[in-house]
UniProtKB/Swiss-Prot annotation:
Specifically methylates guanosine-37 in various tRNAs. GO terms for cellular component: cytosol. The gene is trmD. This is tRNA (guanine-N(1)-)-methyltransferase. It is an enzyme of class 2 (transferase). Belongs to the RNA methyltransferase TrmD family.
Length: 245
């Protein structure tokens, strides 16, 4: 997968390209990340990248010319088929279904806004989709872009040591994750659930499913509303609700 980044702070993306799972994916050439800085496309000695908004009001907008030139340069280099995404609070909220959808694309260009945002006409003419990581305000689009890259990269074949990990993690099936345990067997008087040491894989699977359902129902019940539960899941959920009534 090739991801292009339009950002005034490309150095921030070292967190993605040099560390952790995504850093390893970059080293293995499973993930390519390239950056374009609008400052490199300015025409004045001060490298100005902000401008006043029409109608007044607080704050500034990203200047159209250098931003547009950076976007078009990224499109030209990344090539045809690249989806241009603007990270914006007005966008579609990123969830696991959206991550899987975006992971189907081999080329993405992520536009990171700063200041009060960008000219609406650039969104209309240069952007394919707007995506948000939540209902809150950040100082720029870089952190949302890194969140998106990290989530999407997990679905690139070969990035995770065990591909099943991407499909079994929290939200992969629309449910919260089950509890996990490692050594020691007893920690401060708290023991690992015996079923996890039983060696009975079917019982372990059922226990994990039940825990996921219970956590989801208790902590994020709205997630269950959009799921098509299996007969097994419906039966377990009925038992869980009865126990808590």
């Amino acid at each position: 997968m090739l991801v292009g980044i339009i950002s005034l702070f490309p150095e921030m993306f070292k967190a993605i390209t040099e560390f952790g799972v995504t850093g390893r994916a970059v080293k293995q050439n499973l993930l390519q990340v390239r950056c374009w800085n609008p400052r490199d496309f300015t025409h004045d000695k001060h490298k100005t990248v902000d401008d006043r908004p029409y109608g007044g009001g607080p704050g500034m907008l990203m200047m159209v010319q250098p931003l547009r030139d950076a976007i078009q340069a990224a499109k030209a280099e990344v090539g045809e088929g690249a989806k241009v995404i603007y990270l914006s609070p007005q966008g579609r909220k990123l969830d696991q279904a959206g991550v899987k959808e975006l992971a189907q694309h081999q080329k993405l260009i992520l536009l990171c806004g700063r200041y009060e945002g960008i000219d609406e006409r650039l969104i209309e003419t240069e952007v394919d989709e707007e995506w948000s990581v939540g209902d809150y305000v950040l100082t720029g689009g870089e952190l949302p872009a890194m969140t998106l890259i990290d989530a999407v990269a997990r679905f690139i074949p070969g990035v995770l040591g065990k591909q099943a990990s991407a499909d079994e993690d929290s939200f992969a099936e629309g449910l919260l994750d089950c509890p996990h345990y490692t050594r020691p067997e007893v920690l401060d008087g708290l023991a690992v659930p015996p079923v996890l040491m039983s060696g009975n894989h079917e019982e372990i699977r059922k226990w994990r499913l039940r825990q996921s359902l219970e956590r989801t129902w208790l902590r994020r019940p709205e997630l269950l509303e959009s799921l098509a539960l299996t007969d097994e899941q419906r039966k377990l959920l009925k038992q869980i609700k009865a126990e808590h009534s």
